[in-house]
Amino acid sequence: MRMSLIHKKSDAMLNYVKTVLTRVSFDARLFEKELRKAIKMLIEEEVAELKRWCYVTFADQQHQVILNRCFVVA
């Protein structure tokens, strides 16, 4: 029961981060700032999922540079 609750909170946080990144994606600086915050806040498995999602969702050149810079340490 407890693990299920933790997993739900974890999924909710990851979904929240995805929503934030989508909404700020128009501004490169803000996008990078929010992505760095998310990487620090999420657990390792969530960061891996976020990384996969980001590279699929933000495939344009501008975001690729930011993703490569942020995920090099993640």
Can you describe what each PLM-predicted range is?
Residues 36-43:
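Amphipathic alpha-helical segments that form the core helices of the histone-fold
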Residues 2-33:
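N-terminal acidic leader/helix
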Residues 46-74:
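Short, charged early-sequence alpha-helical segments and their helix-coil boundaries
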Residues 22-23, 39, 55, 59:
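Amphipathic alpha-helical interaction elements
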